Amino acid sequence: MGQKVNPFGFRLGITTDHRSRWFADSTKTGQRYADYVKEDVAIRRLMSKGMERAGISKVEIERTRDRVRVDIHTARPGIVIGRRGAEADRIRTELEKLTGKQVQLNILEVKNPEVDAQLVAQGVAEQLASRVSFRRAMRKGMQTTMRSGAKGIRVQCAGRLGGAEMSRSEFYREGRVPLHTLRANIDYGFYEARTTFGRIGVKVWIYHGDITSRELAQSQAAAPRAPRRNERGDRPDRGARRTRPAQDTTAPVAEAVATGSAPTGTAATEPVIGKGSNGTEA
């Protein structure tokens, strides 16, 4: 499971958070859930088009009623901003034309790009496009990441490696990369290298260490709590049905059959009338 699933979606709410934050319950055209998802994809494609040299790590989108906030995390903010902010103004204008709303553009710098999985994958892909041996490019990226403080890294390349006729995939791993551990802080990145032999996909997993129990408790406290069974409004509480009356654990007192007078200390009871085997009353 952990080997196949996307590490971000696998750890949502534990070590990762959504990169698109908005709410949609309207049925109007342009405000539906599908419309917002399509618009987010278009925004991210616009950011990646023509911005390869900027080293964009991720794009976060947050929506309000009449405004869209776009946070661009980049290793080279100067390229995104441009001279006197000309490039940033151009991006903001295109985003407002795409969304039809006021756009707040924030450009954030990635402090340590050597341990960012998306930037590492992009660096390996650029070397493959420059005809560097895929094994050399993978090992160079791994060594740089491990020297920068990462606890583990795994790099995988798939495609016509080395110009071979048959496509295959190879990966190298250094350190520890626990993909099944949910508390593990795993960063994941993917990038495609366009070579003369076709496209080669590059995937990178970087392990930054486990989050502490204190951080895990804080993240769980911040997450919305699921309603309990007795708090649900769609069905009544059925707890009273399951409760049973307490049983008397004292030994039963044998009833005395009154033949003439009741024994001392006990009340007189009615005589027990039974039937014999022939049907006559005793």
Curated annotation (Swiss-Prot):
SUPFAM superfamilies reported for this sequence: Prokaryotic type KH domain (KH-domain type II) (SSF54814), Ribosomal protein S3 C-terminal domain (SSF54821)
Keywords: Ribonucleoprotein, Ribosomal protein, RNA-binding, rRNA-binding
One MF term in the entry's GO annotations: rRNA binding
InterPro entries: KH_dom, KH_dom-like_a/b, KH_dom_type_2, KH_sf_prok-type, Ribosomal_S3_C_sf, Ribosomal_uS3_bac-typ, Ribosomal_uS3_C, Ribosomal_uS3_CS
Residue spans of biased composition, Basic and acidic residues class: 228-240
Domain KH type-2: 43-111
Region (Disordered): 217-282
Keyword Protein biosynthesis in annotation: no
Entry keyword annotation includes Acetylation: no
Any one Gene Ontology cellular component term annotated for this protein: cytosolic small ribosomal subunit
Alphabetical GO biological process terms: translation
Pfam family name, one: KH_2
Gene3D superfamilies assigned to the protein according to its UniProt record, in alphabetical order: 3.30.300.20, Ribosomal protein S3, C-terminal domain
Biased composition, class Low complexity, residue ranges: 256-269
Subunit structure: Part of the 30S ribosomal subunit. Forms a tight complex with proteins S10 and S14.
UniProt record similarity statement: Belongs to the universal ribosomal protein uS3 family.
Cited function: Binds the lower part of the 30S subunit head. Binds mRNA in the 70S ribosome, positioning it for translation.
Name listed for the protein in its UniProt record: Small ribosomal subunit protein uS3
Organism: Kineococcus radiotolerans (strain ATCC BAA-149 / DSM 14245 / SRS30216)
Lineage: Bacteria, Bacillati, Actinomycetota, Actinomycetes, Kineosporiales
Gene name per UniProt: rpsC
